[in-house]
Amino acid sequence: MIRSLLLTSAVALAPVAALAATPAATTPAATAQATPVAAQVGPQPTLPEPQRGLLPDMKVPRPATWGDAVPTVPQGYSVTAIATDLKIPRQMLVLPNGDILVAEGSGGGAPKLRPKDFIAGFIKNLGKSGVKGGNRLTLLRDADGDGTYEMQGVFAENLNAPYGLALVNGSLFVANQDAVVRFDYVDGQTTANGPPVTLTTLPSEINHHWTKAMTASADGRFLYVGIGSNSNITERGLAAEQDRAMVWEIDARTGAHRPYATGIRNPTALTIQPGTGTLWAVANERDEIGPDLVPDYLTSVQDGAFYGWPFSYWGQNVDPRAQPQDPEKVASAIAPDYALGSHVAALGVSFSNAAMGGQFADGAFVGEHGSWNRSDPVGYKVVFVPFQNGKPAGEPIDFVSGFLVDEGNTRGRPVGVTVDPKGALLVADDLSNTIWRVTPTR
């Protein structure tokens, strides 16, 4: 039935799509993919003229197998698979004893509004794993510290699309798609002691963006949870966006919460910067205004700040699709700190530490899941953003690549990234259902 609808929709829309492919303006910047990818990273990305059309460019590389291959890492580092046969691994948490918790699951399922939603959904699904999400937490243990995680077992199951994880004073918090829940945790335990207790519910109606990123404040008093929008650009109306496209601050003891920062379309990963205690996020920006708009980004998250969605992007660049317009909100919008490139789909972020060594000792690792709405795929790798004096400084460096075989095939898609205290980068790959571990070889 869906295939029939897709074919019917594609035929019906073909004449209009052909017209929509005409550039929105005659300037070189408005020509399809005229903006170099390198020009769209950093604190001041190039922003071309928007291109409107019924259908964006769509290409998703099909799943390929790793075989004997492994991802590519810089000289002086090695990479190994420490866990396989997972069920859609998303985010990870390194526990005090070195054990690793992996959140596995899939959520969402928002009703389709338009024929092109069915088409886009069909295209996106071509690049996904055929494995059903586990809706569980898996625990990995390397008991003798030799880098081989000989234990892989279920810590907790029957969860509801778990994503964000945080450990605070003996409480393990899990951000399901509909609630933050809490398990009691004792160092070294391998399974949860009974079902979790709900700390607070989270917006889950419609669930266009279902992932709930989470991290804890440096003092453990608060949890920060990222809640994505219920649409690309308010197609369901502003009422459907109540309590969405924002980061909540939640009291870890009582569950009381407030909006911490707003106007962030889809904050997919959160982390606290060591030393400063500052909250940082990666976010996925809006679609359907061209292959080179709008850059996904890495940014510090300021208390009370508005980051533009849906009324504007990258500060105060107005998006007329959001109706009714709100000039007052646009005037208050601030630009993010650092562009990662349009449609790279950043889903993970973790700050480095000195143990990672060399040029990778000070900065942030970002997992880029990869694009679906560009004719030339971007992302599909982990990049390192160097920092200086607490801020991004310099161009991103490919740190884990080799996922993308060519434009039509990919072996993996990075999601969560986590640096452990020993100086290893962990990468969750939700296509090959693998956890990769990258370590210095010195």
Task: Walk through the language-model features, giving the residues of each.
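Gram-negative bacterial Sec-dependent N-terminal signal peptides
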Residues: 1-20
